[in-house]
Amino acid sequence: MNPLVFTVIMSTVMLGTAIVATSSHWLMAWIGFEMNMLAVIPILMKKYNPRSMEASTKYFLTQATASMLLMLAVTMNLVYSGQWSVTKPLSPTASTIMTLAMAMKLGLSPFHFWVPEVAQGISLPSGLILLTWQKLAPMSILYQISSTINLDLLMTLSILSIGIGGWGGLNQTQLRKIMAYSSIAHMGWMTTILAYNPTMTLLNLAIYILLTTTTFMMFMLSSTTTTLSLSHTWNKMPLLTTAILLTMLSLGGLPPLSGFMPKWMIIQELTKNDNVILPTMMAVMALLNLYFYMRLTYSTSLTMFPSTNNMKMKWQFNYAKSTTHLSPLIILSTLILPLSPMLALLE
């Protein structure tokens, strides 16, 4: 892709998200979503092949349907209340439809089917944008309407997402699909706490984006897309492979790594609100995610796949690509937990 064209497209993607996050008028929010969707499709099709075309088509159809539901919710709200303001409370029916539209855009269960398929059909840089940046706009809308969301609907979507995110990743060997199912589970955790403490949702989103960005950048650096190729990186880059495995365990929520902090805070917040059954179910289902990350760690670090003696010596040679930019990301992705007492200052 021409660098100038790519710059224009990326600018449009960012502008679309910024319009959604800052607009106070529902029509402008819808325009921002459409700008973002139409600009991100060429990024998904950057490596032109049948799989990326199929993935882009699935993404377009899902997002277009969600945008249509958004406009339906806005129109119904206009009929009920006669106003277009994002900051004013939505009517109950409009709020339910809007929640479903945003769930479809985020890939929450039961609207999650497109996420693993699209993530698998595109390149790693495109997958990074899909699973991080593309979550910002829908989450900003959910944050703004959090006071009027139907709590039962939200909890149902959340529990389903955490469960499906765990079950779906169990039999996967493709790392992009594993990251997609992990994304579904993380979105479930974020939406659970949305009605109780919306600010905590934003903190959770920031940590999720940090962990996912670090993991994808390390995959790109090592050109890794499957569990088999991940096991071979141990011979070439042992330090980077160790960092990948630690970041993945952090994504799974294993203490004392950074990924444990948002889960801990969400469970604490739910129990403060006299909710015991829900966090117990969430904690049990989070073990499914942790299990497939632990299995990945085991197969990579504690077992050696068949390889020649020449392959085992590759770590001795200098690696051409620079890894300087990864150092702060890896540190943040694994060592935020000791800083968590400072978050008490935010309350």
Curated annotation (Swiss-Prot):
Q: Which domain of life is it from?
A: Eukaryota
Predominant place of localization: mitochondrion
What cellular component GO annotations does this protein have?
A: mitochondrial inner membrane
Topology with respect to the bilayer: Multi-pass membrane protein
Q: Name one GO biological process term.
A: mitochondrial respiratory chain complex I assembly
| A molecular function GO annotation | NADH dehydrogenase (ubiquinone) activity
Class of this enzyme: translocase
Q: Where are the transmembrane segments?
A: 1-21, 25-45, 59-79, 111-131, 149-169, 178-198, 201-221, 237-257, 276-296, 326-346
Query: What's a Pfam family in this record?
Result: Proton_antipo_M
What does the record give as the reaction this protein catalyses? Answer: a ubiquinone + NADH + 5 H(+)(in) = a ubiquinol + NAD(+) + 4 H(+)(out)
Its keywords, alphabetically, are: Electron transport, Membrane, Mitochondrion, Mitochondrion inner membrane, NAD, Respiratory chain, Translocase, Transmembrane, Transmembrane helix, Transport, Ubiquinone
- What EC number(s) would the UniProt record show? 7.1.1.2
Question: What is the annotated quaternary arrangement, including any partners?
Answer: Core subunit of respiratory chain NADH dehydrogenase (Complex I) which is composed of 45 different subunits. Interacts with TMEM242.
Q: Which family does it belong to?
A: Belongs to the complex I subunit 2 family.
Mind telling me what this protein is named? NADH-ubiquinone oxidoreductase chain 2
Tell me the gene name.
MT-ND2
